[in-house]
C-alpha cells in the first residue's frame, strides 16, 4: 500500500510540474490516504501479532 502511495505522489508531482493542478491535487490526496491507511493497517497487524504471540507462547 505504501508502494501505491509513492506512485500516486510521483504522479501528483509530475502533474503539478506540467500544470495539471486538479489532477495533481487528486493524486496527492489519494497518496496521502493510501499512506495513512497503510500505516494504520501495519499498526493494527503489529498489535494483533503481539497479542496472539503472547497467547501462543
Curated annotation (Swiss-Prot):
The keyword Cell membrane applies. It is a multi-pass membrane protein. It holds the Pfam family DUF1328. InterPro entries: DUF1328. It comes from the Bacteria. One of its GO terms (cellular component) is plasma membrane. The chain crosses the membrane at residues 4-24, 33-53. It is found in: Cell membrane. Keywords: Cell membrane, Membrane, Transmembrane, Transmembrane helix. Belongs to the UPF0391 family. NCBIfam families: PRK13682.2-1 (NF010231). This is UPF0391 membrane protein XOO1885.
Amino acid at each position: 500500500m505504501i508502494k501505491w502511495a509513492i506512485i500516486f505522489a510521483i504522479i501528483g508531482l509530475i502533474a503539478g510540474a506540467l500544470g495539471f493542478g486538479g489532477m495533481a491535487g487528486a493524486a496527492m490526496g489519494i497518496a496521502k490516504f493510501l499512506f495513512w491507511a497503510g500505516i494504520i493497517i501495519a499498526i493494527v497487524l503489529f498489535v494483533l501479532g503481539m497479542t496472539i504471540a503472547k497467547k501462543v507462547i
